[in-house]
A protein has these predicted regions:
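Active-site C-terminal subdomain of aminotransferase-like
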Residues: 1-92, 96-108, 113-124
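PLP-dependent enzyme catalytic core of the Aspartate aminotransferase-like
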Residues: 43, 102, 109, 125-177
Length: 177
């Protein structure tokens, strides 16, 4: 109908560009964003060093089935990591805990320093059990198709002292038995 045409046009002009381009960022937020960009290389050095320490520690731990981190020499993506990331494996470490989903849930609940959050790349260390959180709406077959297994734990390693991170992981692995 003709009377609704202007309203439809107005709504389209407000929603489509917002969806495609995003909202304008506030000046204060822009300043904070720029401050973060300035220190990003320093933070990434610490993220990568901490992640490698965590991955190497987990690789030797008796309660861990497997570890995936491109900074490890035996990781299937190690060569690509060397080529494209100059040997810096990033801050994500994924591992399989012995005991499956039940152990994974206990591990997450026992962590004290790591936060139980789904976002990644924070200055704080984060941990999640994807099978019971981010991918819980999928059945087991769909989860496996997405690369999510019952024992999988995903860590986003932050900037804390590596000794503190390893201590928290060790106590949580002990509690998960």
């Amino acid at each position: 109908p003709a009377p609704l045409a202007p309203l439809a046009f107005i709504l389209r002009m407000r929603t489509v560009p917002l969806r495609n381009l995003g909202a304008c960022i506030a000046p204060d937020n822009s300043w904070l964003f720029l401050q973060g960009i300035e220190t990003l290389p320093l933070r990434m050095e610490k993220h990568c060093a901490n992640s490698l320490a965590v991955a190497e520690h987990l690789e030797k731990h008796p309660d861990v089935e497997w570890v995936r981190y491109p900074g490890l020499k035996n990781d299937p993506y190690h060569e690509l990591n060397q080529k494209y990331l100059h040997g810096k494996g990033g801050s994500m470490v994924v591992f399989g805990i012995k005991g499956g989903a039940a152990a994974g849930k206990k591990f997450i609940e026992a962590l004290q320093l790591f936060s139980h959050l789904a976002n990644v790349g924070d200055a704080k260390s984060l941990a999640i059990h994807p099978a019971t959180t981010t991918h819980s709406q999928l059945n087991e077959e769909q989860q496996r198709g997405a690369g999510i297994t019952p024992e999988l734990i995903r860590l986003s390693v932050g900037l804390e002292d590596p000794a503190d991170l390893l201590e928290d992981i060790d106590q949580a692995l002990a509690a998960a038995k």
